[in-house]
């Protein structure tokens, strides 16, 4: 059985946590502010620079929510104090990316350039024409934006062309063996 919900979450210095009556948690830090509504089955308290989550009953669904709530709160605390970053690499002849204002222009071997609208709360930098850095305070949003960009041209297993995460390893396949 997982005991993630029983962890005490340390509130970093410079981070302020407010809990409204309807379990609306607002966390403010040096990087920004995040708010999220949590289930009324989980009680959230602040005691001596620690966040404590308690479940109100022992049903299976409530136990699942307990661990999920704890993990989401930890992500919010990390996001407003340190932020999150995902890095993408673009591999392929002529494949490149450029940031123009609030749009990301991708050349991925299609007959047309791909334009990606950068959502609010996320910053995308083209470190090189073949490397992207996606940063923000919302863990879910940063990961979703990275996944959406990667989905335009997933890495293929024969030559490895496409968009991949920086530390991702692509399992390569051997091409067809030549016949007689």
UniProtKB/Swiss-Prot annotation:
Gene3D superfamilies, sorted: Ribosomal protein L6, alpha-beta domain
UniProt entry keywords in alphabetical sequence: Ribonucleoprotein, Ribosomal protein, RNA-binding, rRNA-binding
Coiled-coil residue spans: none
GO function term, MF aspect, one: rRNA binding
InterPro entries for this protein: Ribosomal_uL6-like, Ribosomal_uL6-like_a/b-dom_sf, Ribosomal_uL6_a/b-dom, Ribosomal_uL6_bac-type, Ribosomal_uL6_CS
One BP annotation, GO: cytoplasmic translation
GO cellular component: cytosolic large ribosomal subunit
A Pfam family annotated for this UniProt entry: Ribosomal_L6
Subunit structure: Part of the 50S ribosomal subunit.
Biological function: This protein binds to the 23S rRNA, and is important in its secondary structure. It is located near the subunit interface in the base of the L7/L12 stalk, and near the tRNA binding site of the peptidyltransferase center.
Family: Belongs to the universal ribosomal protein uL6 family.
NCBIfam families assigned to the protein according to its UniProt record, in alphabetical order: L6_bact
The protein's name: Large ribosomal subunit protein uL6
Native source species: Mycoplasma capricolum subsp. capricolum (strain California kid / ATCC 27343 / NCTC 10154)
